[in-house]
Amino acid sequence: MDIRKVTTAEVLPIRHLVLWPNKSPSFCEVEGDDSATHYGAYAGGKLVCVASVYNNGHEARLRKFATLPEYQGQGIGTKVIESLVRDLKRENVSYFWCDARTSALSFYQKFGLCVEGEEFHKSNVAYFKMSVSWEQEPQT
């Protein structure tokens, strides 16, 4: 498996197929996509998992994290999150957060994210905000 940075155009089809197949493809576009960092995991040369990070200085937000159904449960998403977390820490991001579907809370907890606040809904799907704070590395 190979994890690398990819383009917005590459992530959109997987976002649509996995996250919102009953919506229009444009529903899967996010303001800020052009300046976001998009990660992709390839298995056998095929893009199978995507995640997008919107970095605002020392704060970063994960959005539109999706793995093709036939590749779920194989640890691919875990490796993508581990890779982007390493990058964020290297960039001295101190606060990382996402809106997590309630079905995925335990997945994000593996990376130290904790629930913040109350459950809320987007397009009839239940979510919680989850976040983690990291100590910044001293500048040398």
Region spans (language model):
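Conserved active-site tyrosine of GNAT-family acetyltransferases
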Residues: 15, 108, 113
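Conserved short alpha-helix immediately C-terminal to the canonical SAM/SAH-binding motif I
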Residues: 80, 104-107
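Conserved beta-strand in the GNAT
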Residues: 40, 46-54, 61-66
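Conserved catalytic-core motifs of GNAT/GCN5-like acyltransferases
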Residues: 99, 114-132
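Conserved acetyl-CoA-binding loop-helix of GNAT-fold acetyltransferases
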Residues: 67, 73-86
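A conserved beta-turn-beta hairpin within the catalytic core of GNAT-like acetyltransferases
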Residues: 55-65, 72, 122-127
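Conserved GNAT acetyl-CoA-binding A-motif
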Residues: 88-101
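Short amphipathic alpha-helix that is part of the acyltransferase structural core
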Residues: 1-43, 134-140
